[in-house]
């Protein structure tokens, strides 16, 4: 579903940061200021968000992977929920340095987590002493929190979707280093540099975060559905061709 200007207004997407904290590189996206708060120009934000959704839709149709990144308190739950709904990996606890640039190390941790989960399934924890079981539980909980959202990510993602580029500077830098496209919400206090698909908007409001994440997840699901429909149509076309020439 397409996001509307009214939805953006209701979610407070237009509220930027205090004027004294602004980044001049965001000037083209600022409408003005009110009560020392910058107001973001939604006439710029809406088409830019639509462009980002279009890109995401195409990527998903081609079976691309989009990593959702949002570790701030107000975005944590929404990021996990919407990424799971779209069948995509996510990071919502803390970005571990090297998650993309040192993927080999991450793979080792993922294997450890999967082995531990398999041990739980097999009932192996029941054979452990109380102390061993406690240490095991602590380790698996820590791994699930830090990398549980990326355990099924087979490799470096095709793109990353980030809420708050300043807070996730390391993630953006790693993506830039690897040539991974960045789709990101950029507030008035940060620079849009290094972001391929800029979404100028409020990155602190939980309502605004939900709007962005839902919009990206919807685009992914639409892209996948379109790809499936195209395959079905192609198969039908082949069947009709066979019947005509039978």
From Swiss-Prot:
Keyword terms, alphabetized: Ribonucleoprotein, Ribosomal protein
Gene Ontology terms: cellular component: cytosolic small ribosomal subunit
Alphabetical GO biological process terms: translation
GO function terms (MF aspect): structural constituent of ribosome
One Pfam family, short name: Ribosomal_S2
Coiled-coil intervals, chain numbering: none
Domain of life: Bacteria
NCBIfam families the UniProt entry points to: rpsB_bact (TIGR01011)
Entry's family note: Belongs to the universal ribosomal protein uS2 family.
PANTHER family: 30S RIBOSOMAL PROTEIN S2 PROKARYOTIC AND ORGANELLAR, SMALL RIBOSOMAL SUBUNIT PROTEIN US2M
Name of the protein: Small ribosomal subunit protein uS2
Gene that this sequence comes from: rpsB
């Amino acid at each position: 579903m397409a996001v509307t200007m009214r939805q953006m207004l209701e979610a407070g997407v237009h509220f930027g940061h205090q004027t004294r904290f602004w980044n001049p590189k965001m000037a083209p996206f600022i409408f003005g200021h009110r009560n020392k708060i910058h107001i973001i120009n939604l006439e710029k934000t809406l088409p830019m968000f639509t462009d980002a959704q279009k890109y995401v839709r195409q990527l998903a149709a081609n079976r691309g992977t989009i990593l959702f990144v949002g570790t701030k308190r107000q975005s944590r739950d929404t990021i996990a929920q919407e990424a799971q709904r779209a069948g995509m990996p996510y990071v919502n606890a803390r970005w571990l340095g090297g998650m993309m640039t040192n993927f080999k190390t991450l793979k080792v941790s993922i294997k450890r987590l999967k082995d531990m989960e398999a041990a739980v399934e097999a009932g192996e924890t029941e054979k452990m002493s109380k102390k061993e079981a406690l240490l095991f539980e602590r380790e698996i909980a820590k791994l699930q929190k830090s990398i549980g959202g990326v355990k099924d990510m087979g490799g470096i993602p095709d793109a990353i979707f980030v809420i708050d580029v300043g807070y996730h500077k390391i993630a953006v830098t790693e993506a830039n280093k690897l040539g991974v496209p960045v789709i990101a919400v950029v507030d008035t206090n940060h620079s849009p540099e290094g972001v391929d698909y800029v979404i100028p908007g409020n990155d602190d409001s939980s309502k605004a975060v939900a709007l962005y994440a839902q919009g990206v997840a919807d685009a992914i699901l639409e892209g996948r559905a379109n790809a499936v429909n195209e395959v079905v149509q192609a198969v039908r076309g082949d069947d009709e061709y066979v019947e005509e020439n039978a």
